[in-house]
Amino acid sequence: MKALHFGAGNIGRGFIGKLLADSGIQVIFADVNDHVIEQLKTQRAYPVKIVGDRLNVIETVSNVTGVNSKNEADIIACFTEVDLVTTAVGPNVLKIISSTIAKGLSARFRAGNTRPLNIIACENMVRGTSFLKDNVFSYLTPEEQQQAEAQIGFVDSAVDRIVPPVQFDPANPLLVTVEEFSEWIVDKTQFKGTIPAITGMEQTDNLMAFVERKLFTLNTGHATTAYLGKLKGHQFVKDSIDDPDIREAVKATMQESGAVLIKRYGFDPHAHAAYIEKILKRFANPYLQDDVDRVGREPLRKLSYNDRLIKPLRGTLEYGLPNQHLIQTIASALAYRNESDPQAVELAQLLQQDTLESAVKKITELTESNIVQQIVTAYNALQKN
């Protein structure tokens, strides 16, 4: 079996690509990074360092190669022979690669390849593959769309593994460090043909419960740790979560978002409390030097209507649940400043150009004046400190 994976960065190599290769699948990495692709083509293997309380080992991932995304014809040619396509490029890049994927599918159809092909976007976004499908279909003819509906599975997934950037090592340019924990859950109802046997890929027919569990817990908690840590001058996530005041606030925020999950999906409260504790422990992993600016980057996206801060807040409003810690986290996200992050710069400009209430409504798309005013009050309190 052969897979084409878009994105040869840390997550691509350290998470999805590793699971595929470990399952005996030949992996072709597609990326614009010339150096990484040349290294993959030459070495056909790379090291992954796995770190945790019980583990600190380097494993070799083999049976891999690379193709340069700048040479679109080479990418398109891959579509005639692969059995699986995956991505780990970031939500903002999905739209960019959709035209290439559409051309690849067209080439596959023209070549007479009628075997089922499944595409899985492994991104930090809700229903990322469905978003990708909509963009891919915008480039296909009606006839190609009909053929794609019959042969191409667009499979939504939820992914969870902390993969921070590591200092470049000239002796091991492909080395990536990952935490021991990983979770990859796919919607089994969306596959075409036989579901591939991939170790570490879990199947479910209730994906949204797991998507929101991860978004409302791991992502919400991670963002909270970063934004509160930034305000107190911490550089790393571990330093932030080791701060007792921040740890207490992060836990309380995840408990508020967790109450929404328990109400919406019937999660067991004790099991979810244990899940929160596991995540707090992951944030404190001493082997992961994860910068708060990496975790807090792109604040406008993280403050958007369906993302990790506003969506759980909306859930508390829907079910009449407590939300004071979520409001404090949102205020701290609004206070995030980083001159090297274009979205952080734009965020600061938006808050200066308009009244705070109007800016918060524009950024979050929240319409309830009462909750917007509470966010504004919390933000103003932060500015005075």
UniProtKB/Swiss-Prot annotation:
Q: Which residues are recorded as binding NAD(+)?
A: 3-14
Q: What class of enzyme is it?
A: oxidoreductase
Q: What is its EC number?
A: 1.1.1.17
Q: Which SUPFAM superfamilies match?
A: 6-phosphogluconate dehydrogenase C-terminal domain-like, NAD(P)-binding Rossmann-fold domains
Q: Which UniProt keywords apply?
A: NAD, Oxidoreductase
Name the encoding gene, please.
mtlD
Q: What cellular-component terms does GO give this entry?
A: cytosol
Q: Give the lineage.
A: Bacteria, Pseudomonadati, Pseudomonadota, Gammaproteobacteria, Pasteurellales
Q: Which GO terms describe its biological process?
A: mannitol catabolic process
Q: Which family does it belong to?
A: Belongs to the mannitol dehydrogenase family.
Species name: Pasteurella multocida (strain Pm70)
The molecule here is called: Mannitol-1-phosphate 5-dehydrogenase
Instruction: List the Gene Ontology MF annotations in alphabetical order.
Output: mannitol-1-phosphate 5-dehydrogenase activity
Q: Could you tell me what reaction this enzyme catalyses?
A: D-mannitol 1-phosphate + NAD(+) = beta-D-fructose 6-phosphate + NADH + H(+)
